[in-house]
Amino acid sequence: MISESDILKCFQHLVDSSYHKDSILLGSGDDAAVIDTQGRKLVHSVDISRIGVHFHESMRPEDIAYRSITTALSDLAGMGSFPSFISIGLTSDIEEISWYEKFSKGIKETLDEFSI
């Protein structure tokens, strides 16, 4: 089985050849990357959660949202940073609008809990 580290190595050349590579203080690793943006350090993290790997399909949408966000927050904490905002990417075959409404509610509740 291919490891996450092996896959990340396939993309390292993109960082190495970036026009802005001097702004990349710490390249993307398992947790996050540190980027210098006009004198401020920005820690950027992207996570993917997958049904059957990170959560079971029987979980409530609110709980999936909570788990997804708190996992990302843990990565940021591991880098010694504090969250300012989140960005969400979602792919799904679920065709019930109520599922997305509940997922959205779970996101809002989690963001409120952590004052984001």
Where are each of the predicted segments found?
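Extreme N-terminal cap/leader segments of soluble proteins
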Residues: 1-60, 79, 88, 105-110, ...
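A glycine-rich phosphate/pyrophosphate-binding beta-strand-loop-alpha-helix module
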Residues: 62, 66-116
